Regions:
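Conserved ABC transporter NBD signature motif
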Residues: 55-70
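Conserved ABC ATPase signature
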Residues: 123-127
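Catalytic Walker B motif of ABC-type/P-loop ATPase nucleotide-binding domains
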Residues: 148-151
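A short, surface-exposed alpha-helical micro-motif characterized by mixed small hydrophobic
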Residues: 189-191
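ABC ATPase "signature
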Residues: 207-208
Length: 234
């Protein structure tokens, strides 16, 4: 298959409430997809179904291969690392969780790739907010994933930190890694995403490249588009 991920007409119900109502989306190699929508719109539930954390009541999820778990990376907002360990020690430990033994050279190369070479021996607790975000992403790369899920990767960062994370994410996509990320920052979405999927009340209300969506809906910006399509939904 040409896609790394195909979610097809997903449905998830909780009693009489339908949290996900026919959501479909795809991620191709090297593609950066933004999943956006109001709080409670069904984004998190959609991702939980895709990742196998919840069983769908309808639809299906198809990956590029059977049992792809060891080639999927997940970065959550909550810092996943051990604060008392150095950046290098965290990376070595998390690689072991995936059954991977990294050499010193491999650890150094991965830290360099994520802009962390100068703080390899610094405890995670002493890293800046931007460095901690980059370390969180580095940990997801320890097992060489082909598909990444990033939860608000630029949230709570200053402009330099957001810039550095965007460069890192683009560099990963350039190697063929497929990336799906969530964000409430429409400016960041416009700068980073190849494609935007907007979920409102459990349904996909828009799906396409940012420039195409603006033209299709006659919006001046992604923020205007978001506000128009989510009116009375938040």
């Amino acid at each position: 298959m040409s896609h790394l991920l195909e979610a097809q007409h997903l449905i998830k119900r909780y009693g009489s409430r339908t949290a996900v109502d026919g959501v479909s989306l795809e991620v191709s190699p090297g593609e950066i997809v933004a999943l956006i929508g109001p709080n409670g719109a069904g984004k998190s539930t959609t991702l939980e179904v895709i990742l196998g954390l919840r069983a769908p009541d309808g639809g299906k999820v198809v990956f590029w291969r059977k049992d792809p778990q060891r080639e999927i990376g997940i970065q959550l907002q909550a810092t996943p690392f051990f604060r008392g360990l150095t950046a290098a020690e965290n990376l070595r430990l998390f690689a072991r969780f995936y059954g991977v033994r990294l050499t010193q050279a491999q650890i150094a190369a991965l830290l360099e790739r994520c802009g962390l070479a100068s703080v390899a021996r610094t405890e995670a607790a002493k890293l800046s907010g931007g460095q901690q975000k980059r370390l969180a992403i580095a940990l997801t790369l320890a097992h060489h994933p082909r598909l990444l899920f990033l939860d608000e990767p630029t949230a709570a960062l200053d402009p330099r930190g957001r810039h550095d994370i965007r460069i890192l994410i683009r560099s990963l996509a350039a190697t063929g890694v497929g990336i799906i990320f969530t964000s409430h920052d429409m400016e960041e979405v416009g700068k980073l995403a190849d494609r935007v999927v907007l979920i409102v009340a459990g349904r996909v209300h828009a799906d396409g490249a940012p420039v195409d969506l603006l033209a299709r809906f006659g919006a001046a910006s992604l923020e205007d588009l978001y506000l128009d399509l989510t009116a009375d939904k938040e």
